[in-house]
C-alpha cells in the first residue's frame, strides 16, 4: 500500500529521526513487524478508505463514543493539517475496557489508525506537502484520578504504544488547553523524558486559548471545539 511503504511514509520516518538513516530504517522495520503482529494489512483493506471521523462506524464505535468521546476530525487547519479534539474530562479509561474489553478496544484502534494514516496520505498528495495532525487536548475540569487507570496502562503498554510508534511524524502540534497548575508542574518533569522532536511540538495554554488557536485554524473549526457538549462555548 502506498500509504504504508511509499515515499511519503518513508519520509515521515526520516524526518521523525532527524534524517538518521540507521534509526529510521530500524523504526521502519519495527513498524513492519507491528503490522505483521496485528495483521494490519487486512485492517487496511477494510478501513483505510473510510473517513477518519467520530461517526465512521469503526468496530465498537458506539462504546468508544460513550466512554472516550471527541472529534477525530474537527476540521482542517489554515495550513491544511487535520485538527482533532480530545476532552479528557469525558474519558473513562477503565470503563471502556470494562464495557468492551481489551481485544475490542484494540480492534477499534487499529481500524481508526489505518483510516488516519490513509487520510494523511491522501491530504499530502492533494496538497503537495506533508499533512499532519494538530491535536487539541482539553484539560477543563479534569481530575487526576481520571488519568490513572492501571488496566488501561497495561493495555496501552501491551498494544497501543507499539502501534503509535509505527505512526512516526504525524503530529504537527499538540495544544493542551485549559491547563491547570498541577498539569503544568507535571509536564515540566515529564518533558525531559520526551524526545526533543516531540517536546518542541507541545504547547500548554490556559483558559485564554482562543487567540492562539485562531492562529492555526479558522472560527468554524474552533467553534466545533468550543461548542462540544459540556464546553458551553468556552
Task: State where each predicted segment sits.
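Basic, amphipathic alpha-helical/coil surface patches used to engage anionic, phosphate-bearing ligands
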Residues: 1-234
Amino acid at each position: 500500500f502506498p500509504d504504508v511503504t511509499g515515499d511519503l511514509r518513508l519520509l515521515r520516518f526520516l524526518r521523525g529521526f532527524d534524517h538518521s538513516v540507521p534509526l529510521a530504517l530500524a523504526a521502519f522495520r519495527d513498524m513492519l513487524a507491528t503490522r505483521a503482529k496485528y495483521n494490519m494489512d487486512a485492517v487496511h483493506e477494510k478501513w483505510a478508505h473510510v473517513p477518519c471521523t467520530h461517526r465512521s462506524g469503526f468496530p465498537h464505535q458506539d462504546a468508544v463514543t460513550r466512554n472516550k468521546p471527541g472529534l477525530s476530525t474537527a476540521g482542517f487547519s489554515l495550513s491544511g493539517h487535520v485538527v482533532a479534539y480530545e476532552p479528557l474530562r469525558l474519558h473513562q479509561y477503565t470503563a471502556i475496557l470494562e464495557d468492551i474489553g481489551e481485544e475490542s478496544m484494540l480492534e477499534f484502534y487499529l481500524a481508526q489508525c489505518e483510516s488516519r494514516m490513509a487520510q494523511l496520505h491522501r491530504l499530502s498528495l492533494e496538497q503537495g506537502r506533508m499533512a499532519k495532525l494538530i491535536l487539541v487536548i482539553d484539560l477543563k475540569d479534569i481530575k487526576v484520578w481520571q488519568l490513572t487507570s492501571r488496566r488501561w496502562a497495561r493495555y496501552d503498554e501491551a498494544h497501543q504504544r507499539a502501534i503509535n510508534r509505527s505512526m512516526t511524524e504525524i503530529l504537527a502540534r499538540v495544544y493542551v488547553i485549559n491547563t491547570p497548575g498541577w498539569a503544568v508542574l507535571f509536564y515540566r518533569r515529564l518533558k525531559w523524558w520526551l524526545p526533543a522532536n516531540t517536546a518542541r511540538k507541545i504547547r500548554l495554554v490556559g483558559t485564554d486559548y482562543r487567540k492562539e488557536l485562531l492562529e492555526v485554524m479558522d472560527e468554524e473549526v474552533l467553534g466545533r471545539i468550543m461548542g462540544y457538549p459540556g464546553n458551553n462555548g468556552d
